[in-house]
């Protein structure tokens, strides 16, 4: 999908905050939205949290009308949803880069429609920037890797010899055709598949998946883990839905991908 050039605009206040947190700065401390268990596992995996990073984009999502009786992608809306997320992600990566981080873990992508304007939505990307104790873990583009895996899954991934390259995503906003009255009446009271609806949902998910896979291929990934397939209605009404696919692209660091077998643990209680 073609998009406009992504412009990373970071507020001055954010840059001052990042400068204070940068490793080596006087009184530097880290911030993180990881849980205690996740934080300790990320440290065990050989990474040190350096700061909470975020990116935001307030985006006006325009209007595109689908044909009443037709299944069709609303490509302008697909591009808008994709581009807005890309802006937020890029600004988050820019903050991580300012901290000298090698990657961002536990990334969350959220959308919140605002009441102070019609069709205005804030796209937010937030995660914990981390720096490796040894070596460089940046991707082939020289950017910090991004991952939406939990701290536990990130630890397991690294322990088994894989490296995250980046979050990859695909979006498809699709208009699902209305069922004509004669067909709807003919199906009344019957158990029967509705091929028009089946084809619409199938096609929309496939488009989202294929776009996510194309992003993974661009990163020279071996695979994508933790994939989520989401159906998001937003505010467009019952027959227009965004199908969104997202996951973490990975590649192998070594041929051996075994993990230690779990051990037996006995509690020291009488319950």
What are the residue ranges of the model-derived segments?
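Hydrophobic, ordered structural segments
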Residues: 84-138
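Short, well-ordered alpha-helical segments
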Residues: 53, 67-108, 168, 173, ...
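Intrinsic disorder/low-complexity detector
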Residues: 1-77, 119-197, 248-271
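Short, conserved loop-to-beta-strand elements that form functional interface hotspots
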Residues: 103-115, 223-236, 257-265
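Short amphipathic alpha-helical surface micro-motifs
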Residues: 30-38, 87-88, 106-108, 146-152, ...
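Short, flexible coil/linker segments at or flanking structured domains
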Residues: 41, 47, 69, 92, ...
């Amino acid at each position: 999908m073609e998009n406009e050039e992504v412009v990373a605009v970071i507020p001055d206040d954010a840059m001052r905050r990042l400068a204070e947190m940068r490793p080596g700065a006087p009184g530097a401390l880290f911030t993180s939205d990881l849980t205690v268990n996740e934080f300790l596992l990320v440290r065990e995996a050989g990474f040190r949290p350096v700061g909470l990073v975020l990116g935001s984009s307030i985006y006006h999502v325009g209007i595109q009308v689908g044909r009443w009786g037709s299944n069709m992608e609303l490509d302008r809306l697909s591009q808008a949803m994709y581009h807005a997320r890309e802006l937020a992600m890029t600004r988050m990566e820019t903050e991580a880069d300012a901290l000298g981080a090698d990657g961002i873990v536990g990334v969350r992508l959220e959308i919140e429609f605002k009441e102070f304007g019609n069709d205005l939505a804030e796209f937010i990307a937030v995660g914990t920037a981390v720096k490796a104790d040894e070596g460089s873990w940046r991707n082939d583009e020289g950017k910090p890797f991004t991952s939406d895996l939990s701290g536990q899954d990130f630890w397991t991934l690294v322990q088994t010899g894989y490296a995250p390259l980046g979050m990859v995503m695909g979006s498809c906003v699709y208009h699902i055709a209305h069922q004509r009255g004669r067909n709807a009446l003919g199906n009344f009271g019957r158990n029967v598949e509705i091929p028009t609806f089946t084809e619409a949902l199938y096609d929309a998910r496939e488009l989202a998946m294929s776009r996510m896979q194309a992003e993974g291929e661009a990163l020279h990934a071996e695979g994508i883990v933790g994939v989520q397939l989401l159906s998001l209605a937003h505010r467009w009404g019952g027959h227009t839905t965004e199908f969104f696919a997202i996951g973490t692209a990975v590649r192998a660091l070594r041929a051996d991908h075994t993990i230690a077998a779990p051990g037996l643990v006995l509690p020291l209680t009488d319950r």
